Amino acid sequence: DITAQVQQLVGRSGVKTGLCHLFIHHTSASLLITENADPEVHRDLERFMARIVPDGDPLFKHDEEGPDDMPAHVRAVLTQTSLAVPVAGGRCDLGTWQGIYVWEHRHAAHHRRVTVTVLGS
């Protein structure tokens, strides 16, 4: 959950009304806005994605980094590598139950870089 860090960056930008754009610099992770109240939502999303893009599928030949390598790329393609969030009142204008997340598609945690650009006045 990177919501607090993003809100802090938006606040420091001085922009009151505008747009916050986020971009992840990786091909095996993605960004999403989803419910922030019930952790079961995240587990359900993981289970769903594992069902439609299973690790170790013999269809995938790109497996140099392990059986989760190519499935992670496919999962990233099926989701989002960038987000655009409106800024109002100097904050990301998210719904009550919305949070901004980096979704890691590999089994092991990796360092991920996200660029946040805030535009507006």
Question: Where are the regions a protein language model picked out?
Answer:
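Active-site histidine-anchored catalytic micro-motif
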Residues: D1-S121
